[in-house]
From Swiss-Prot:
Membrane-spanning ranges: 122-142
Gene for this chain: OSCPNX1
Role according to the record: Component of the phytosterols biosynthetic pathways. Oxidosqualene cyclase converting oxidosqualene to cycloartenol.
Keyword Transmembrane helix annotated: yes
Upper classification of the organism: Eukaryota, Viridiplantae, Streptophyta, Embryophyta, Tracheophyta
Entry's Gene Ontology cellular component terms: lipid droplet; membrane
EC category: isomerase
Annotated source species: Panax ginseng
Catalyzed chemical reaction(s): (S)-2,3-epoxysqualene = cycloartenol
Biological-process GO terms, alphabetical: pentacyclic triterpenoid biosynthetic process; sterol biosynthetic process
Main location: membrane
Compartment(s): Membrane
Enzyme Commission number: 5.4.99.8
Protein's name according to its UniProt entry: Cycloartenol Synthase
Amino acid sequence: MWKLKIAEGGNPWLRTLNDHVGRQIWEFDPNIGSPEELAEVEKVRENFRNHRFEKKHSADLLMRIQFANENPGSVVLPQVKVNDGEDISEDKVTVTLKRAMSFYSTLQAHDGHWPGDYGGPMFLMPGLVITLSITGVLNVVLSKEHKREICRYLYNHQNRDGGWGLHIEGPSTMFGTVLNYVTLRLLGEGANDGQGAMEKGRQWILDHGSATAITSWGKMWLSVLGVFEWSGNNPLPPETWLLPYILPIHPGRMWCHRRMVYLPMSYLYGKRFVGPITPTVLSLRKEVFSVPYHEIDWNQARNLCAKEDLYYPHPLIQDILWASLDKVWEPIFMHWPAKKLREKSLRTVMEHIHYEDENTRYICIGPVNKVLNMLCCWVEDPNSEAFKLHLPRLHDFLWLAEDGMKMQGYNGSQLWDTAFAVQAIISTNLAEEYGPTLRKAHTFMKNSQVLDDCPGDLDAWYRHVSKGAWPFSTADHGWPISDCTAEGFKAVLQLSKLPSELVGEPLDAKRLYDAVNVILSLQNSDGGYATYELTRSYSWLELVNPAETFGDIVIDYPYVECTSAAIQALTAFKKLFPGHRREEIQHSIEKAALFIEKIQSSDGSWYGSWGVCFTYGTWFGIKGLVTAGRTFSSCASIRKACDFLLSKQVASGGWGESYLSCQNKVYTNLEGNRSHVVNTGWAMLALIDAGQAERDATPLHRAAKLLINSQMENGDFPQEEIMGVFDKNCMITYAAYRNIFPIWALGEYRCRVLQGPS
């Protein structure tokens, strides 16, 4: 039976700063699990399989089965419902909250964080399997049980038409279909296995233009595997890393997630690396193309992209640029004497790869550059210590649920979820009943703050200050993020106001000052906050965005979510420490509020870039402005935002927004105008902050009724459609949101609507 293990090391090649706090890995143990537990696991797997086309999102049931046995909760209060025409009583809200928090406390790990699924994208696992296959360690890293669960996941998320999407809820794409088909073949599935599934997948590929029409990232992966020629790729010259930093196009000015992906890609491209040509590779050359491999026009293939994948079409200037680099630049740098510069650039790239690896304890900023960096380390030296240090950290990215084993979009969302969970529980004004839960969470948050900057000259490594920040996941990961720092900061400040005998000692003031310093350092000149770093270049650089599948990825843009979170954190700090950098903080808050007003859409909404979508962005927009001192009566932006949200409430009383809002940038209801507990929570929080209860509380009562009646018998809330997003077009799972935001919204509703303003 599979078991989720928390904060464990046990491998001599693992490095850690804090005894692996937050680490979550799944291990298979054939000697555990009662017959009843094993039967329950098989039952939920079968249920997912039988309903996979109607309900594409797993509900993290394997973790729930394990924790139900390990963390038995107190006696569950009887379930309550609100009938039509019935007024909502404070008692029913309180019972719902206690049931919800009692259940959610059982999902907390012993180190204080809440583990959960952070999967969703369908293009991550292929990179891992391709890399393991090339480097010859597939069977070392992945046991037969791992392979079985990965295959289960891939088959479960194959669409009816035979293809695979960019993410679990998306329509079939060439990128998703080719890579997942290849992954299954590398895992040992035959070309006609899967009860016809492989044949359907292959037919989808051939019917839609064949693998020559895969996206640029797909072309790169197929090229290193040996199923595509490098001449069919647009250039990624490593020499760009030797350019003067003053140039706007220097890669050090890119958004760090893109920079850290194109860094190892440029190494592999610069070396034209190709893995061993195995019988499976030779067979794939026949399976995924519609003409014989040796007859493919690779130059034409460079710019081919299936229409199903084309979210960001290449502008003409980009095609001219790639053609120039391909026909002029590359022939020069592949031969002496210019080849000397190529070799120098490759050495520079590897220095940056090693710096990234070492400063994330070989976790890396994300799963794409994790496996690419690992492959580059192997290409540089197959017997290197760096390659061996990479191997055990692969398991940090693997998550298991009833739909199978997936690769997550990070090594988890540990800090992010815990910071929100703390704020949600405290909002209920019932915190004294959940002291042990909050104490453990407080300990986790104190253990997860980044305590040092990266070593060396930060400018030379294109890094921002880190000391005092909070990461998205774990301290071992360590990359600082503006909104994660702000949300973590808000949570520890709220905890500091509770009795220390209940929640533990507060964070030392010096570490709070470090957090303030990070937040202030991340504000751009326009008042907005980006994610990891300052915005370092210009939006016109999107003209050279080579990733057809993603939008707005080349630079680190300022976002309403990050800007609002910074306002909230600085305001909370200012109230507790009014003398520390007072004028700087006040000036920062005012600039940030003006930025939020400036980027509001004409319909009153804000576009959410990290959650689905306008309900998420508008919650942050309203919250930021209210925290900065604006009110409904004094601020037209807040009035417009409230009108927008109220116009989107559906007949059931809730809100339900489709992921299509993200990619199309137009508010789109869920199919059938259904509600979603997470969207409903966000909208409620926004409207409560904007004083909706003082004007007309009816919309809030209707929404609260929806949340109360959505609660499950055990106190959990249902997993509904996917609610996270990145790069405008790819969705990602936040499994904890279904618990956090109903608790938070009902907590605020209980204290600020039913009980009235304090």
